[in-house]
Structures are given as C-alpha cells and as structure tokens.
C-alpha cells in the first residue's frame, strides 16, 4: 500500500473492490482477493483478514477516500465499521478468473470435507476417504456454487449421491464413551457438549463419564481434545456407528 499526496489519497494494489451506491454517491471498500466471498459465506469472520485498509473510498483505483460528510449524509452515520459492514453485505464486486478458480477449489475442498465428516459406508460402517467422495461427486455431475456455504452444499451433495446411487452412503453418527478425571471432566464438559450431536448419558462420581453421539468428523476433534487436556490419561472409546436419524 502506498500513501501519496495530497492527503486523502491512498493507492492500493492487488485488490478486490466492493462497490455500493447510496444517497446518490458511490462508495467502495478495498479487500484482499478471495476474501469477500469467504466473508459472505461466514468462512472468514475477521474483518482485518478481509480488508486491505479499514476505510471507505469514493474510488479505490484513484485512491480517493470518502469524506465524513458524504458518509454521514448517505448512511446517517459516520461509524466506519457499520458502513463497511453494510457495503460488504450489500455491495457488488467482480471476481477475476484466477480468483473465481481459487474460490471454486476452496469451496469444493470444504464440501468434500463436510461430506466425509458427516457420512459413512453403511456396509463397512466406516467413513469414506476424500478421494472416493471426490470421484463420486464428479461422476454424478455435482457442481459447486460460490454463493452458498460449503456446509449447505455438502447436504445437497449427500442427497444427490443418494439419489444417483453412485456409492452406498448414509448420514452417520458414532456412539462414543468418554472417561476422564472428575476435575478435568468439569473443565472439558462444555467443549465436549459443543462437539456432540447428543449426550445420551453423563455421570460424575469418582470420574467423569459421558456417552455421546457425534458425527464422524468430530470424533477426531474430541479424541485430540481429551488426549491433549488429560496428557493421555483420559479415554475415548467408540461403542458403535450407525445411520443417523433424519
């Protein structure tokens, strides 16, 4: 970023511009490439990772910063954060070919990750490797959208795989048993609950014991959490794996 004279002109390079018209004037914010769609899809939540500079422009390419008077007149406020959020939510932006390809690839990888985390082969009762999910999605003609979240598209992908019968696949849940020291159990309880679909049993006596239903993708997170926080003294045991209720 280069700041140049006169004051009020800021020149940016390698930028994705979000444009928004309000109150008869044009306003723009300068963002990093690939980040606007991620922010709208709630993949990226840190505005500092989205914005190249925390300011509002009349024209990014010319480096013209919007005046406080123009902002107040158009938006009814000169609160930069509120104005930036409105522009990001409602503004238009163009996506270049390289940026579009990056977005599509990133979203596709996220979709595959969600599908492998939520599903299993009903015959083996085990999750599919990502490579098999990728091939099945390709064979059934699944197409990626950059305007929808990866999770919502993963649910669509699962439905399409089931309809096309490319591979036997069902939504899955694992029943697991977690045993840790009472003190550690009280400390971990809320985090374990946030990762579980359902808590079937929970006992706190000489030790903390919990029977929970989780999606396959969260089993690894729970196992790592318990091992790290208990220094390998806790236990996570898989009791069974079954088709999830729909």
Curated annotation (Swiss-Prot):
It comes from the Eukaryota. SUPFAM superfamilies: FYSH domain, Hypothetical protein AF0491, middle domain. The keyword Transcription does not apply. Gene3D superfamilies: 3.30.70.240, Ribosome maturation protein SBDS, N-terminal domain, SBDS protein C-terminal domain, subdomain 1. Disulfide bonds: none annotated. Its main location: cytoplasm. One of its GO terms (biological process) is ribosome biogenesis. GO terms for cellular component: cytosol; nucleolus; nucleus; preribosome, large subunit precursor. Involved in the biogenesis of the 60S ribosomal subunit and translational activation of ribosomes. Together with the EF-2-like GTPase ria1, may trigger the GTP-dependent release of tif6 from 60S pre-ribosomes in the cytoplasm, thereby activating ribosomes for translation competence by allowing 80S ribosome assembly and facilitating tif6 recycling to the nucleus, where it is required for 60S rRNA processing and nuclear export. This is Ribosome maturation protein sdo1. The lineage of its organism: Eukaryota, Fungi, Dikarya, Ascomycota, Taphrinomycotina.
């Amino acid at each position: 970023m280069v700041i140049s004279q006169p004051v009020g002109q800021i020149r940016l390079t390698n930028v994705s511009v979000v444009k928004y018209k309000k109150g008869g004037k044009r306003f723009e914010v300068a963002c990093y490439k690939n980040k606007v769609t991620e922010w709208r899809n709630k993949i990226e939540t840190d505005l500092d990772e989205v914005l190249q500079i925390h300011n509002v422009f009349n024209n990014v390419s010319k480096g013209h910063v919007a005046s406080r008077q123009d902002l107040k007149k158009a938006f009814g406020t000169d609160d930069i954060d509120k104005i930036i959020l409105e522009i990001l939510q409602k503004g238009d932006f163009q996506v270049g070919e390289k940026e579009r390809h990056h977005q599509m690839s990133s979203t596709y990888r996220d979709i595959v990750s969600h599908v492998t985390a939520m599903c299993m082969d009903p015959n083996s009762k085990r999750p599919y490797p990502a490579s098999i999910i990728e091939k099945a999605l390709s064979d059934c003609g699944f197409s990626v959208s950059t305007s929808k979240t990866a999770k919502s598209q993963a649910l669509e992908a699962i439905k399409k795989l089931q309809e096309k019968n490319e591979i036997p696949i069902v939504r899955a849940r694992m029943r697991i048993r977690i045993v840790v020291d009472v003190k550690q159990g009280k400390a971990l309880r809320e985090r374990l609950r946030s990762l579980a679909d359902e808590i079937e049993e929970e006992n706190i006596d000489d030790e903390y014991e919990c029977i929970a239903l989780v999606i396959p993708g969260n089993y690894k997170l729970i196992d790592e959490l318990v091992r790290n926080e208990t220094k390998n003294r806790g236990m996570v045991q898989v009791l069974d794996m079954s088709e999830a209720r729909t």
